Amino acid sequence: MKNDHINYQQNLSQSPILNSNKNQTQQNQQQQQQQQQQNPQQQQQFQHQQVPQLSPQQIPFSEPLKNNLTLQHQQQQQQHQQLAGGQHGSLLRKSYSSRFHEKPQGELTKIANFQDVSPEERPSLFLLKLKQCCYVYDFSDNTYMVSKGVKQEALLQCVNFLSTNDQPLHESIYKMVFEMVAVNLFRPLPPRINPYGVMYDPEEDEPILEAAWPHIQVVYEVLLRFIDSPTFNTHIAKNYVDDRFVLQMLDLFDSEDPRERDYLKTTLHRIYGKFLGLRGFIRTAIRNLFCTFVYESHQHNGISEILEVLGSIINGFLVPLKDEHKQFLIKVLIPLHKPKSYSVYCSHLGYCMSQFIEKEPSLAEPIFKSILRLWPCGNSQKEVLFLSEMEDLLGLVSDEQFAKFRNQFFRQMTKCFQSEHFQVAERALYLFSNENIVLLIASKNNFTLALETFYKPLHENSISHWNRSIRNLSISSLKLFMEIDMDLFNKISEKYKESKKKQQQIQQREKFKQNAPETQKSKQINQNNNNNNNNINNNNNNNNNNNGSTETKADKPSMIRRKSLLPVDPSTIAALSSHRSLEDIMSTNSNSGNDDDDENNHTNHDSEIENEVKEDFRVPVNNRYTFT
């Protein structure tokens, strides 16, 4: 091997293509140095390209100048957006697809084609073309158009070389291939929130396509052709395809461009198949990515593609399954039912669930119980997707496994039957059109419980549901149960009628009890009033017997009546008894001189009345008195 390596290096050094290209590169470097000396502003221009641009809103200008700058900034963004792939996505959301660190260099020169050289010189020419492909350009502007064309042509020629080459390649070419792939592919993706604050929604917004896709696509093709080539040596490639390479590739799955995610899916599957030592690390990295998505970020663009790769990986698991794989199912895959973006990857997640049930049927119980526990109560669209997944998985479950979670399943189905959202109820009732599900329900062990659980909601739906199609489906479901076992159906219907009558009787009793306390209260009030009246009459009789002397003076109207338990004030009684009208007072004043003798008679008469009233009201304090 050492001798071959030395001979290979000697051949490369003696190659006329390499020598000519070296001379060309030296000349280009000298020209660049002269240009930089003559134009010192050119170097500043390259340095300026690496500085991140600020929006006009972030720079303190005067208002008129600031408005002008904002208009120019928006026009530049629109131009970049059109160059990046047309009218894809919202202009307010993002302006650039990805961020490359462009290398300042001159224009690339075209190298000879593979057809123009001998087969022995093609590996060295392939190495030169790979070096040319390591230059990265910004596709948001129209600069370096010649170099972009030269690079794209070199990439296409590399693809053709790898598809036709049947000779083993040297380790230096392995290093150069993966270096070129890393330079072109591994880049920071744009943030989800731009300065305008609008977030990308994968379900509603159109994705912004990658501006540099003409080059990136061919780079992916080079990598795939290189890994799939019959002369590919994993022992050499494992020095360059390591854990860091895998992590950087998994980070690219968050790209908005679906074309890139499709290539990443294929590439990751090839790496998993070729590099046996990386399989455990790839599964661990996928587990960490899923856990971050479920419990932290809740946003990722490539979950569906990763699950598709994972489905093929699970398909290759050996039976019986390892505890590691079972824990991966319970702690990583099943929690993927929680996020709101479940509709994006539900089909691939359901396929992974079905693969685990096929590999080990005993996993059906934890899978179904977990899905029923994570059932979305407030999201009708997600409920419909859950019902579809349940239908697919029930086709793989045996009668013995179904008996372990049938109670939870039947309870959830009754809730879905009675749902006010007609799509949920309709999708749940369509389960009875699946032969596998009907066979599970119609078995001897499950039919009695199923009919007892389903009869009431189906009967109520057939009568009172607001949607006509739901009423018709409920009636057809009842007919299906009737055809399976007529006798049992009649028994359960009679039980339902009896329970309905009992409920009506209970409701009537409750209404009667609610009205009964009101009548009892009215009776008690009447009795209390009667008792009070009797007590008042008795007290009056006692007072009349004890005060017989006052009854002789019935000529004078009584001025008082019972009112409260307070004692009687003699001064009040005297004031009331001595009350006279205004005419009497006026007449007394006018006749005061003539009636001096009568004044003594009046005072004596008033004192006699006061003494009589005091004697009449010498009663206990507990008696009630009022004044009229």
Curated annotation (Swiss-Prot):
InterPro entries: ARM-like, ARM-type_fold, PP2A_B56
Positions of region (Disordered): 1-61, 500-558, 577-628
Keywords noted in UniProt: Cytoplasm
Gene inactivation effect: Null cells displays higher PP2A phosphatase activity compared with the wild type, around 10 hours of delayed expression of ecmA and ecmB prestalk markers, inefficient culmination and higher GSK3 kinase activity.
Compositional bias per record (Polar residues), positions renumbered to this chain: 1-22
Keyword hit for Membrane: no
Location(s) in or outside the cell: Cytoplasm, Cytosol
SUPFAM superfamilies: ARM repeat (SSF48371)
Major localisation: cytoplasm
Basic and acidic residues compositional bias, start-end: 600-618
Top-level division of the source organism's lineage: Eukaryota
Keyword match Cytoplasm: yes
GO biological process: cell differentiation; cell motility; chemotaxis to cAMP; chemotaxis to folate; meiotic sister chromatid cohesion; response to curcumin; signal transduction; sorocarp development
Bias-annotated ranges (Low complexity): 23-58, 524-547
GO molecular function terms listed in the Swiss-Prot or TrEMBL record: cAMP-dependent protein kinase regulator activity; GTPase regulator activity; protein phosphatase activator activity; protein phosphatase regulator activity; small GTPase binding
A GO CC term attached to the entry: protein phosphatase type 2A complex
Record family assignment: Belongs to the phosphatase 2A regulatory subunit B56 family.
Protein name (Swiss-Prot/TrEMBL): Serine/threonine-protein phosphatase 2A regulatory subunit psrA
Organism (species): Dictyostelium discoideum
Lineage summary: Eukaryota, Amoebozoa, Evosea, Eumycetozoa, Dictyostelia
Gene that produces this protein: psrA
